[in-house]
């Protein structure tokens, strides 16, 4: 949504990879050939718009079909006004506000083989507002990683 990104976008990327790793659990997808990307969109307005889309008079696509945001919102729900507060591009904000309200899915339904902690971490990394996501230190200090964390004397 924004042209300038901070480290928060890396947390989003790790969250997407985390979700895709959850798909590799047999309990979540029994047929390995049916495993797929978490958000396999073809474009994402405004940074990578669909060049074939019909647009309104200010250049905003009239359809959101196949926009990556549609796929994201199908999972995490549409953002609230406060969750959109970081968006500075007026066209992007208008585009977001045109999405019909929908709730987040139950992550347990999508990933029945994931532990409660794994799903909690996934949800935290996939928060729409980048400033609401945990940072790397918060994630690494999460109790979920207690059994695998190595401490260094350096």
Regions found by a protein language model. Give the residues of each.
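Conserved end of the kinase activation segment
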Residues: 1-9
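Activation segment of protein kinase catalytic domains
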Residues: 25-42
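Short acidic/histidine-centered micro-motifs embedded in hydrophobic/aromatic stretches
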Residues: 41, 75, 90, 141-143
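C-terminal lobe substrate-recognition/regulatory segment of protein kinase catalytic domains
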Residues: 48-60, 66-124
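Regulatory extensions flanking the kinase catalytic core
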Residues: 97, 124, 131-154
């Amino acid at each position: 949504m924004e042209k300038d990104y901070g480290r928060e976008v890396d947390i989003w990327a790790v969250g997407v990879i985390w979700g895709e790793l959850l798909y590799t659990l047999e309990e979540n997808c029994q047929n390995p050939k049916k495993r797929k990307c978490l958000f396999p969109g073809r474009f994402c307005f405004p940074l990578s718009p669909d060049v074939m889309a019909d647009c309104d008079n200010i250049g905003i696509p009239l359809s959101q079909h196949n926009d990556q945001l549609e796929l994201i919102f199908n999972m995490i729900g549409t953002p609230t006004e406060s969750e959109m507060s970081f968006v500075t591009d007026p066209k992007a904000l208008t585009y977001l506000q045109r999405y019909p309200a929908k709730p987040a899915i139950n992550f347990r339904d999508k990933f029945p083989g994931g532990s409660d902690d794994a799903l909690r971490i996934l949800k935290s990394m996939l928060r729409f507002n980048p400033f609401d996501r945990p940072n790397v230190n918060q994630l690494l200090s999460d109790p979920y990683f207690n059994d695998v964390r190595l401490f260094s004397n350096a």
